[in-house]
From Swiss-Prot:
NCBIfam families: rplT_bact. The keyword rRNA-binding applies. Its main location: plastid. It is found in: Plastid, Chloroplast. This is Large ribosomal subunit protein bL20c. It comes from the Eukaryota.
Length: 117
């Protein structure tokens, strides 16, 4: 039986996986089987944490807005501010007021005072 020369397909696949896992530590970047497992695990974590990142940022923005609004007036809270925004039909997402709260608190104070009136 004659010798069959293998193609480059399998080597190309393994090289692609190795390049992906080149920053992993130890055997996770050297051995093909563990590299493949770690690549799948990394992709699963990335997919899961994409949704988690959205939740975390929303939580952070809400906390920032709430802190600034409570600092201004004791009776005024985050939920009341958002409720008044919706009543006035000012459709702002949580990110914009949070940035305003950090960069320019007086601006957020004026917005909240105008909404109350």
């Amino acid at each position: 039986m004659t010798r069959v020369r293998r193609g480059y397909i399998a080597r190309r696949r393994r090289t692609k996986i190795r390049l992906f896992a080149s920053t992993f530590r130890g055997a996770h970047s050297r051995l093909t089987r563990t590299t493949t497992q770690q690549k799948m695990r990394a992709l699963v974590s990335t997919h899961r944490d994409r949704g988690r990142r959205k939740r975390d940022f929303r939580h952070l923005w809400i906390t920032r807005i709430n802190a600034v609004t409570r600092e201004n007036r004791v009776s005024y809270s985050y939920s009341r501010l958002i409720h008044d925004l919706y009543k006035r039909q000012l459709l702002l997402n949580r990110k914009i007021p949070a940035q305003i709260a950090i960069s320019n608190r007086n601006c957020l104070y004026t917005i909240s005072n105008e909404i109350i009136k």
